[in-house]
Amino acid sequence: MTLAKVFSQKLRELGISSIYIGHERPSLQSLAIKMLLKNYGLVEERREGMLITQDHGIKLISGKGTETSRYTFRKGGKKVSIHLPEYPKMVIDLGLFEFLNEEEKEKTLLQVDLCLSVIRKFLWDGNLTVVGKADYVLGRANIVQSLSLSDEDNPVILDPYGDVVATDQILRDHNVFVIGGIVDKGRRLDRATERLALSRGYSFPRVKIQLRGSIIGVPDEINKILEIILRVKELDQSLEEAIISLQSKSDKISRLLHDVQLYGMEVLEEEARWLRADDKVIEIVRSRLGKN
């Protein structure tokens, strides 16, 4: 359950159906994050404004208008006590970080940094854990040296060479997702997640995310893997839709090249529509195949 949904349920319990938000971003998720991490909350005062949006049944009002609210969201306001979602827990394990060269370390930490903004789209910092780098600071995410999990956590580790193929249901049924702080596909340290799992003694399932039977075209950035999982679990998107939505142009090109080489040029247009690839991507694919 997203933080926005938890927040909206608590507001309704308190009899609050609308909030005047001033210049704040019109999103309950954004308001809840700001309330948790900064000195913001609700002040009981009557304000009039224009209905900007209705988010999870709560009216968000701003500017001038005829809509009324008894509560204003602002700095110094009273915080609303909400039950923070314990699951899902997203874990990034940096156990192989010291084996990376400097360029790889820089890219890895950039992707991990981006995970904070991703987790805040759905949950909050407390649902993110970084393992194996004691001097690392990432908002209010949990920074630990080793991971302690129970059977109730029902964990899996994401590995492009794992023996379990991810499905929508598998992702929705599990509570904890471990992502290795390194990219496996075609990089210097091949099958690094398998190596990480062995070194850590992780005995739980190694799950691979595929797109119609292949890992080609599946984004491999840590932050995007995390968001794919959260879109399936928290927004009820299909796994395929989440993958395609987060593909870069490079991901689309790689998949189109793979499929055209496998099935022939006649599939290019249909595959491009499936991947929502634009004309520029199709042009690049044709050029690389010498078909211009």
Swiss-Prot record:
First-listed, main subcellular location of the protein, grouped into a coarse class: cytoplasm
Annotated signal peptide: none
Keywords carried by this UniProt record: Cytoplasm, Methyltransferase, S-adenosyl-L-methionine, Transferase, tRNA processing
The keyword Transmembrane is assigned to this record: no
The keyword tRNA processing appears for this protein: yes
Localization: Cytoplasm
GO molecular function terms listed in the Swiss-Prot or TrEMBL record: tRNA (adenine(9)-N1)-methyltransferase activity
A GO cellular-component term linked to this record: cytoplasm
Enzyme class: transferase
Catalysis: reaction(s): adenosine(9) in tRNA + S-adenosyl-L-methionine = N(1)-methyladenosine(9) in tRNA + S-adenosyl-L-homocysteine + H(+)
SAM-dependent MTase TRM10-type domain segment(s): 72-253
EC number: 2.1.1.218
UniProt superkingdom: Archaea
GO terms of biological process kind: tRNA methylation; tRNA processing
Recorded family membership: Belongs to the class IV-like SAM-binding methyltransferase superfamily. TRM10 family.
Its biological purpose: Catalyzes the S-adenosyl-L-methionine-dependent formation of N(1)-methyladenine at position 9 (m1A9) in tRNA.
UniProt-recorded name of the protein: tRNA (adenine(9)-N1)-methyltransferase
Top-level taxonomy: Archaea, Thermoproteota, Thermoprotei, Sulfolobales, Sulfolobaceae
